[in-house]
C-alpha cells in the first residue's frame, strides 16, 4: 500500500441505540487520522436514532437497513464505502484517538487482509477481548498477548485468528473479494465467518494490541445492559449454521459434538440464571426454546446453502459507492481537568465549575478528559459520556508512591494518595496526545504534574486553605489536626503558588486575596476568566413566566439562600434575616444547600431564632439535585448570599441567570459580580447588616416595579458576561496562550 495513511471508511451499524449513537460519533470526531469517512447504517429503529443521524447531516453517509440483521447492515455499509480500508466499530463504542493509525500500519504488508485491535469492556479498565483464536466450530480460544497468530494464517487451518466486530478492519479488496458478510448471521459469528473465509482465501488476519476501543455494552433487542439474553434465537441460528457449514465437512462427528456441547452449555447457563433469580421461569423457558429452534434452523439453512462459498454483498451492492466523504474531526486541544468531585454525586463549587468548563470546551470542539474520584465503594471506570471522557479513579493511601509524595511535598496522606492516582492516570493519557492539564489549588489535586516536564500544567485559583482558615474555627479548636492536616496544606499551597507558571483566576479579587494571605503576587502569571453558568430558563420558560406574573400580582416575595450552613457562607446572617422575615407577612425564605443537622440547629438556637424552624414561611429543603436547585432559582424572586468570602460567587450568577436580584456582602469577588447595575445590592459587613438586608426585602416586597426592573438587570448582566459560552471562549484563549508560551520556551 503506497500511502502510509490509506483512506478509511468507518462503518457504524445501529439499531435502536439513539442514546449511545451520538457519543459514538463524537468519539470518532476525536480520532487523529488524516483521511476517513463515517458511514452510519440505521436498522429499523423506532427510537431517536434517525434524529441523531439527521443532526450530523452531510458529515456522514447515512443509510438504511430495513432488517434487524447485522450482516445485512454491514454489507450495506461495505457497499457505500469508498476507502481502501473498511473499519467497523459498534454504536456503543469509542476508539482511542490513535485507533486508525495503529490499524492501518499493518496494511503496508500486501498480504494482510484484516487487522483488529484490543477491546476494553464497559468498566473502561478491564479487557473484553484481546487476541482470540477460533476453531471451525465457532469456539473461541483466548490466547496470551504474546501469542503469534501469523502461522495460523493458512487455508484450511483448524484454528485461525478471529476479530471482534466492534474493533475490526478489512482491506476493501479482500472483503469484497470474499463477498462480504453472509446474511444468515443476523447476530453472532458474522465477523468470525469473514475471518475464516479470508484465511481460506489466502489473506492474513493480524492483531494490533495498541488499537484500542472502549465498548460500553449498551442494551439491545438481543441482550440487556447486564448482558442477559432477551432472546437466543439469532445467536443459536448463527452457531448452528457455522458449525454445520465449516465444521461438518471435515469432521461430521465433531460437528455433532460441538452442537450438543453448545446446547448443553447454554441450557446450563439459563438454569443458573433462573436459580439465581436473574430471569424467571417463563424467561428461561423462552430462552431454552429459542436455543433449540435456532440450532435446528441454523443447521437447516446450512444444508440448504449447499456449496456456497462467499458472502451476500452482491445482494445489496447494486452500484459503485459514492465518492469518499471526509469526516470532520474535532480540531481542538486535548485537555484534562482534575476535580475530585463530579456532579451529580458532588455538586460543590469546584465540581460544578469543572463540569461547566468541560461542557463548554467540548461544545467548542475540544477533547476533554475528567479525572475524578469514584464514589465510595465503586470500582474504577473509564467511560465516554456526552462527549467527555470520564475517568473515575480510586486512590491508594497504602501505596509506596503515596508515601513518597507525603515526604516530598509534605501533603497529608489523603491528598497525597489522590494526587498520586491523578499523576498515574495523566501518564496513561499521554498516549492520547494530551495538550494541557488543569488542577484546582484547593487540595492540590494534581501537584506532582506541576513538576513533571512531560505535562503542560495550569492551576485554577479558588479559595485556598489559607483563605478559608479565618472562617473555620473548628480548625484551630483541634490543634493536632491543624498541625497534621491544615498547616501542611497551607505550606504546600504557598509553595505551589510561588512556582506555578500558569494560573487561571476567576476574578481579580482572588489574585488580591492570595497576595494578601500568601504574600505572592500572581498577576504576572494569571489570567482572569470569569465563571459562567447555563440558562435555567431553557427548560423552564413557562415557570419563569408564571413567576413573573405572580411577582407582578404581589404574590408572596420568595427569598432564596443557597449554600452550605457555615460561617463563610453567612448562614448565621441568613438565619437572622429569616427571623426578621417572620414579621413580614408577605415574604418567604427558603434554605437550600445544607443539612439542618445538630450543629445547624444549635447555631439557630444560639441566635435566638428557633421560631424559624417551625414557621410556615421559612423552609429548609436540604441538599438538592441540580434540577431541583434550578427549579428553586426560577421559582424565587430574590437571592440572599451573605458570604464573608467568595473567590468568585457561582451562586450569584446562577441566581442572576434566573433573573434574581442578589443581596450580598462586600466580600471577595462579590462586588465585581453583584453590582447595582446588575440588579444587586452590596452591604457592608457590620452590626446592622441584618437590619439593612431586612429593610431591602421590605422595599422589594412593596415596590414590585423596582423588583421587576432589577430582575431584568440581573438577567441581562448574566447574558452579557456570565454565560457558559463566554467562559469557555475565555478559557480556550487562556489555554492557547499557555501552550504558545510553552512552545516559545521549548
Across the structure, where does each feature detected by a protein language model lie?
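N-proximal low-complexity "stem/linker" segments adjacent to membrane-targeting elements
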Residues: 1-27, 327-329
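A conserved acidic beta->alpha catalytic loop
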Residues: 27, 42-51, 93, 535, ...
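Aromatic "clamp/platform" in nucleotide-sugar-dependent glycosyltransferases that forms part
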Residues: 66, 644
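Non-catalytic, C-terminal membrane-associated alpha-helical segments of glycosyltransferases
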Residues: 251-331
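Acceptor-binding helix/loop patch of EC 2.4 sugar-transfer enzymes
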Residues: 400-409, 453-491, 536
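Glycosyltransferase donor-sugar binding loop
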Residues: 533, 588-606, 622
Amino acid at each position: 500500500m503506497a500511502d502510509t495513511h490509506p483512506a478509511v471508511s468507518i462503518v457504524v451499524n445501529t439499531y435502536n441505540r439513539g442514546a449511545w449513537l451520538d457519543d459514538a460519533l463524537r468519539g470518532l470526531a476525536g480520532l487523529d487520522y488524516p483521511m476517513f469517512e463515517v458511514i452510519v447504517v440505521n436498522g429499523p429503529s423506532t427510537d431517536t436514532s434517525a434524529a441523531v443521524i439527521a443532526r450530523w447531516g452531510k458529515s456522514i453517509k447515512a443509510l438504511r437497513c430495513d432488517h434487524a440483521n447485522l450482516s445485512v447492515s454491514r454489507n450495506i455499509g461495505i457497499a457505500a464505502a469508498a476507502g481502501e480500508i473498511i473499519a467497523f466499530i459498534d454504536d456503543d463504542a469509542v476508539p482511542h484517538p490513535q485507533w486508525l493509525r495503529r490499524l492501518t500500519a499493518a496494511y503496508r504488508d500486501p498480504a494482510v487482509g484484516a487487522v483488529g485491535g484490543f477491546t476494553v469492556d464497559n468498566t473502561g479498565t478491564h479487557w473484553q477481548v484481546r487476541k482470540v483464536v477460533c476453531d471451525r466450530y465457532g469456539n473461541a480460544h483466548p490466547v496470551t498477548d504474546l501469542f503469534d497468530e501469523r502461522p495460523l494464517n493458512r487455508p484450511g487451518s483448524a484454528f485461525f485468528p478471529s476479530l471482534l466486530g466492534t474493533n475490526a478492519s478489512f482491506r476493501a479488496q479482500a472483503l469484497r473479494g470474499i463477498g462480504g458478510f453472509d446474511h444468515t448471521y443476523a447476530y453472532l459469528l458474522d465477523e468470525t465467518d469473514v475471518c475464516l473465509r479470508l484465511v481460506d482465501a489466502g489473506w492474513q488476519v493480524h492483531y494490533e494490541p495498541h488499537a484500542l476501543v472502549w465498548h460500553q455494552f449498551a442494551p439491545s433487542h438481543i441482550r440487556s445492559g447486564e448482558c442477559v439474553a432477551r432472546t437466543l434465537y439469532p445467536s443459536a441460528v448463527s452457531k448452528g449454521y457455522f458449525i454445520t457449514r465449516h465444521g461438518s465437512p471435515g469432521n461430521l462427528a465433531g460437528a455433532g459434538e460441538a452442537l450438543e456441547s453448545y446446547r448443553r452449555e447454554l441450557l446450563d447457563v439459563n438454569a443458573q440464571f433462573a436459580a439465581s433469580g436473574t430471569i424467571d421461569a417463563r424467561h428461561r423457558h423462552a430462552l431454552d426454546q429459542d436455543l433449540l429452534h435456532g440450532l435446528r434452523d441454523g443447521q437447516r439453512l446450512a444444508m440448504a446453502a449447499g456449496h456456497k462459498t462467499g458472502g451476500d454483498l452482491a445482494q445489496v451492492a447494486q452500484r459503485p459507492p459514492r465518492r469518499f466523504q471526509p469526516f470532520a474531526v474535532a480540531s481542538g486541544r486535548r485537555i484534562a481537568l482534575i476535580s475530585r468531585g463530579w456532579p451529580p454525586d458532588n455538586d460543590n463549587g469546584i465540581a460544578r465549575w469543572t463540569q461547566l468548563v468541560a461542557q463548554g470546551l467540548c461544545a467548542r470542539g475540544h477533547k476533554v478528559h475528567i479525572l475524578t474520584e469514584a464514589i465510595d465503594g465503586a470500582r474504577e471506570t473509564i467511560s465516554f459520556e456526552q462527549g467527555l471522557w470520564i475517568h473515575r479513579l480510586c486512590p491508594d493511601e497504602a501505596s509506596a508512591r503515596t508515601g513518597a509524595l507525603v515526604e516530598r511535598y509534605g501533603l497529608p496522606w489523603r491528598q497525597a494518595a489522590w494526587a498520586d492516582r491523578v499523576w498515574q492516570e495523566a501518564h496513561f493519557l499521554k498516549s492520547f496526545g494530551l495538550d494541557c492539564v488543569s488542577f484546582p489549588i484547593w487540595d492540590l489535586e494534581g501537584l506532582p504534574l506541576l513538576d513533571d516536564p512531560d505535562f503542560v500544567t495550569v492551576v485554577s485559583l479558588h479559595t485556598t486553605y489559607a483563605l478559608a482558615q479565618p472562617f473555620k474555627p473548628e480548625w484551630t479548636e483541634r490543634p493536632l489536626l491543624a498541625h497534621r492536616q491544615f498547616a501542611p496544606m497551607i505550606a504546600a499551597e504557598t509553595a505551589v503558588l510561588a512556582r506555578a507558571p500558569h494560573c487561571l483566576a476567576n476574578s481579580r479579587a482572588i489574585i488580591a486575596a492570595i497576595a494578601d494571605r500568601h504574600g505572592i503576587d500572581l498577576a504576572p502569571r494569571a489570567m482572569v476568566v470569569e465563571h459562567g453558568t447555563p440558562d435555567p430558563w431553557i427548560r423552564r420558560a413557562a415557570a419563569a413566566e408564571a413567576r413573573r406574573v405572580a411577582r407582578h400580582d404581589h404574590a408572596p416575595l420568595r427569598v432564596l439562600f443557597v449554600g452550605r450552613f457555615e460561617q463563610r457562607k453567612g448562614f448565621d446572617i441568613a438565619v437572622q434575616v429569616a427571623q426578621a422575615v417572620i414579621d413580614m407577612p408577605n415574604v418567604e425564605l427558603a434554605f437550600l444547600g445544607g443539612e439542618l443537622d445538630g450543629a445547624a440547629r444549635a447555631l439557630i438556637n444560639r441566635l435566638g431564632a428557633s421560631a424559624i424552624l417551625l414557621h410556615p414561611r421559612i423552609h429548609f429543603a436540604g441538599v438538592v439535585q441540580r434540577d431541583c436547585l434550578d427549579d428553586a432559582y426560577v421559582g424565587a424572586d430574590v437571592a440572599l448570599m451573605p458570604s464573608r468570602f467568595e473567590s468568585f460567587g457561582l451562586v450569584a450568577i446562577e441566581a442572576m441567570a434566573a433573573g434574581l436580584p442578589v443581596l450580598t456582602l462586600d466580600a471577595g469577588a462579590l462586588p465585581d459580580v453583584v453590582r447595582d447595575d446588575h440588579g444587586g445590592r452590596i452591604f457592608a459587613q457590620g452590626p446592622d447588616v441584618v437590619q439593612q438586608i431586612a429593610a431591602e426585602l421590605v422595599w422589594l416586597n412593596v415596590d414590585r416595579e423596582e423588583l421587576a426592573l432589577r430582575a431584568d438587570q440581573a438577567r441581562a448582566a448574566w447574558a452579557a458576561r456570565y454565560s457558559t459560552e463566554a467562559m469557555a471562549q475565555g478559557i480556550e484563549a487562556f489555554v492557547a496562550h499557555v501552550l504558545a508560551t510553552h512552545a516559545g520556551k521549548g
